Curated annotation (Swiss-Prot):
It comes from Lacticaseibacillus paracasei (strain ATCC 334 / BCRC 17002 / CCUG 31169 / CIP 107868 / KCTC 3260 / NRRL B-441) (Lactobacillus paracasei). It comes from the Bacteria. This is UPF0210 protein LSEI_0897. Belongs to the UPF0210 family. Homodimer. Pfam families: DUF711 (PF05167). PANTHER family: UPF0210 PROTEIN MJ1665 (PTHR37560:SF1), UPF0210 PROTEIN SPR0218 (PTHR37560). InterPro entries: UPF0210.
């Protein structure tokens, strides 16, 4: 690298909030399956402890050695619903407790993979896991959960959509923060390093390292330096910046994998914001020339950003994967929080933005009395966007008991502040109750 590029990278870290958002170790648990879920749980704990024993020390050492902040150390595991084996009891709580205990003992921030993949239908084990979510997320601290209810090739499992509307509500009624650990997906990916939706897919290897980078502040400052630039110049600026950001993720991931003696898998190119000043994806869109996020033109600006990040980042990494784009979590983005609190952005506009961004309706707080069917409708709408457009979409919605539109909820830390957003008061009950499946779109048939 040229001296100027090295200086720019140092400035990105020291002044513009550039960091490695996560190093996530994926671990297969398929070899832990026995005929008894308690025995399986014991094997799960033992394998996680063995494979990830040095994850945190190695990540901390790399951070100290190279001066690169590594914010989170995480683990993703095989979808737990696949671990039932021959046990007819279908009580997955021991496995959840084993995962939580391992995460605490290892010092990792979160562990994902309490997951069911039900896009084609639900087995008894998967139904049991979904119904266990309210209790499991309330009795564990670091376990994250996800459910994939649809895909472009399979269509949408509307029975699961209905169930998850009820489950999300029950999860949040115990404690709103519990809902932050649950994501409902369409087209979920197997190598996502970001929580709460990470799980280690069954086509992945035994163990590997994935990294997720973050640099909204870096991109924003680069664009701000060119106030009169054309769209082509803006795209080129974002691509060059994304290359540097992603190169750092590739470097750190390779070093970590070498030291842990495991394969390096992918870099997730996503721009992940935090509530910190200058670490906002929404601010990037505003710097492009929008008075505030939510203004007409917001979706186009986000599409430009998302595509340019991918084009720049893909040249910097051996393999890219995960979600790779720009996250728009309402409560975790300072400028998004401001726009939502002022009523400058609506759920409907957020939904439109999800058609071109990395994932979906993320960290959205709604009134606690929102009906189950309405939440199911939100999930179905978001999943339909993913199904038709062949992209990953998701819903991480938080019904907050006792709160109404205009109230503010403090989640704290990286989870930020959530203004309670207005939600359409129409009734989706009859639609959701129809049951069955919405078939896959015609363009899904590729063979």
């Amino acid at each position: 690298m040229e001296t100027q590029q090295i200086k720019e990278t140092i400035e990105m870290i020291s002044e513009e909030n550039l960091d490695i958002r996560t190093i996530t170790m994926g671990i297969s648990l398929l070899d832990c399956v026995t005929g008894d879920l308690q025995t399986t749980a014991d094997k799960v704990y033992a394998k996680i402890m063995a494979k990830a024993a040095n994850l945190v020390p190695v990540a901390d050492a790399i951070s100290d050695e190279y001066g690169i902040p590594i914010v989170n150390k995480r683990i993703s595991v095989t979808p737990v619903s696949l671990l039932a084996g021959a046990d007819q009891n279908l009580d997955f709580r021991p496995i959840a407790q084993a995962m939580d205990r391992a995460a605490k003992d290892l010092g990792v921030d979160l562990i994902g993979g309490y997951t069911a993949l039900v896009q084609n239908g639900s087995t008894p084990a998967e139904t049991a896991l979904m119904k266990s979510l309210p209790e499991v997320l309330d009795t564990t601290e670091r376990v994250c959960a996800s459910v994939n209810i649809g895909s472009t090739r399979s269509g949408l499992n509307m029975d699961a959509v209905k169930l998850m509307g009820t489950v999300v509500k029950e999860v949040a009624m115990r404690k709103p923060q519990n809902a932050m650990k649950l994501v409902v997906f369409c087209n979920a990916v197997e190598d996502n390093p970001f929580m709460a939706g990470a799980f280690w897919g069954i086509s992945e290897g035994d163990v590997a390292i994935n990294t997720g980078v973050s640099g909204p502040g870096v991109v924003e400052r680069a664009i701000a330096a060119k106030p009169a630039a054309s769209f082509e110049e803006i795209c080129e600026t974002i691509k060059q910046t994304a290359f540097k950001v992603s190169r750092m993720g590739q470097f750190v991931g390779k070093v970590a994998a070498d030291r842990l003696d495991v394969p390096f898998n992918i870099v997730d190119l996503s721009l992940a914001p935090t509530p910190a000043k200058g670490d906002s994806v929404a601010q990037i869109l505003e710097t492009m020339g929008l008075s505030h996020v939510g203004t007409p033109g917001t979706t186009a600006a986000l599409a430009l950003l998302n595509d340019a990040v991918k084009k720049g980042g893909i040249m910097a990494a051996e393999r890219v994967g995960g979600l790779s784009g720009a996250f728009i979590p309402v409560s975790e983005d300072a400028n998004m929080i401001t726009a939502a609190a002022k009523g400058q952005i609506s759920l409907e506009k957020l939904e439109a933005m999800t058609a071109v961004c990395s994932v979906g309706l993320d960290m959205v707080a709604v009134p606690g009395d929102t009906p189950d069917a309405t939440i199911s409708g939100m999930i179905a709408d978001e999943a339909a966007i993913g199904m038709i457009n062949n992209k990953t979409t998701a819903v991480r919605v938080i019904p907050v008991p006792g709160k109404q539109v205009g109230d503010i909820v403090e989640f704290g830390g990286i989870f930020g502040t959530a203004p309670i957003m207005a939600i359409n008061d129409g009734d989706a009950q009859q639609f959701i109750n129809r049951g069955g499946r919405i078939p896959a779109p015609i363009h899904s048939f590729k063979n």
